[in-house]
């Protein structure tokens, strides 16, 4: 009797997929969703639905903070309609325009009770000016750290996530010191510097410029309608239509950033670059990259 021959050519992809699934981190209950702006608000709304689900789905109590916007009532109202249509139990706007409002017992009570906070787009400097070093920010920070709150920020609401924040700057130029304006962010994910509308506005040069100035931070560039979901266990996962660019200076060997004029080109040696798309994962501390499971094919 002839020995049975096993064709392993078709089994290898399945074995690879199973192995990858075993290594793939599972979603934690709460997370921080950092959105590159212009997220889909009309059709599938995948990113907003993910936030809604992480905030409790039909039991969600969502608080919208539109402080970055010049039209907070209008933009806040739009998100209220979206999350009410999804079926949230309660949705409200905290229309905080002055720092004094952050002392309000009613505002603090809302933030102690809600399951999700959404920071809208607008001007990141305005948002930081209103919220930084206030009781509101302390409640959000403590509840996020404790796994009691899901937080999302889009556009300006994404830019504020790091301790070092890109406040403005140019696009599409050779990296140089004058290309990026830095300020202090809210420090919710202090290890990163976030840029948004990333490839849509050709912002690679300014993110590299920011990382050259702060080589102890990880640069995260997020495209429009794209989200980096930061899990509590250190994993980042990509959702949406675009990509997340990671500029990792861990192995940086040289930069002339401290020594050149503001408009002179920067030298930055030995940066590591990752371009991640839907389903890809990156570990914030281990610097490990995992591809999306569905990418493995025969």
Curated annotation (Swiss-Prot):
- Superkingdom assignment: Bacteria
Q: Which Gene3D superfamilies match?
A: 3.40.50.880
SUPFAM superfamilies in the record, alphabetically?
Class I glutamine amidotransferase-like
Q: Cite the GO molecular-function annotations of the record.
A: peptidyl-dipeptidase activity; serine-type peptidase activity
Entry EC no(s):
3.4.15.6
Q: Which CDD domains match?
A: GAT1_cyanophycinase
Q: Where is the active site?
A: 155 (charge relay system), 173 (charge relay system), 197 (charge relay system)
Pfam family for this entry, one? Peptidase_S51
Q: Could you confirm whether the keyword Protease appears in this record?
A: yes
Catalytic activity as recorded in UniProt = [L-4-(L-arginin-2-N-yl)aspartate](n) + H2O = [L-4-(L-arginin-2-N-yl)aspartate](n-1) + L-4-(L-arginin-2-N-yl)aspartate
The family annotation for this protein states: Belongs to the peptidase S51 family.
Known role: Exopeptidase that catalyzes the hydrolytic cleavage of multi-L-arginyl-poly-L-aspartic acid (cyanophycin; a water-insoluble reserve polymer) into aspartate-arginine dipeptides.
What NCBIfam families does the database record attribute to this sequence? Answer: cyanophycinase (TIGR02069)
User: What is the name listed in the Swiss-Prot or TrEMBL entry for this protein?
Assistant: Cyanophycinase
Q: Which gene encodes it?
A: cphB
């Amino acid at each position: 009797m002839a020995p049975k021959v096993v064709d392993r050519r078709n089994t290898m992809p399945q074995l690879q997929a199973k192995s990858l699934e075993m290594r793939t981190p599972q979603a934690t209950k709460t997370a921080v969703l950092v959105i590159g702006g212009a997220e889909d608000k009309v059709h599938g709304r995948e990113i907003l639905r993910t936030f809604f689900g992480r905030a409790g789905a039909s039991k969600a109590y969502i608080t919208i903070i539109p402080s970055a916007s010049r039209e907070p009532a209008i933009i806040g109202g739009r998100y209220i309609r979206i999350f009410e249509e999804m079926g949230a139990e309660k949705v409200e706007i905290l229309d905080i325009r002055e720092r004094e409002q952050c002392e309000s017992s009613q505002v603090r009570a809302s933030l102690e009770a809600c399951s999700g906070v959404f920071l809208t787009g607008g001007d990141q400097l305005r948002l930081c000016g209103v919220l930084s070093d206030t009781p509101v920010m302390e409640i959000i920070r403590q509840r996020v750290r404790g796994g009691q709150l899901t937080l999302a920020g889009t556009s300006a609401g994404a830019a504020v996530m790091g301790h070092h924040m890109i406040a403005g700057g140019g696009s599409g130029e050779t990296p140089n010191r004058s290309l990026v304006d830095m300020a202090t962010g809210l420090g919710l994910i202090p290890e990163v510097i976030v840029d948004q509308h990333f490839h849509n506005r050709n912002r690679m040069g300014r993110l590299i410029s920011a990382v050259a100035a702060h080589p102890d931070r990880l640069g995260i560039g997020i495209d429009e309608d794209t989200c980096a979901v930061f899990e509590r266990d250190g994993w980042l996962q990509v959702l949406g239509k675009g990509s997340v660019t990671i500029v990792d200076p861990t192995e940086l060997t040289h930069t002339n950033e401290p020594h050149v004029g503001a408009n002179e080109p920067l030298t930055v040696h030995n940066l590591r670059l990752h371009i991640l798309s839907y389903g890809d994962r990156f570990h914030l501390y281990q610097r490990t990259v995992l591809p999306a499971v569905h990418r493995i094919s025969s």
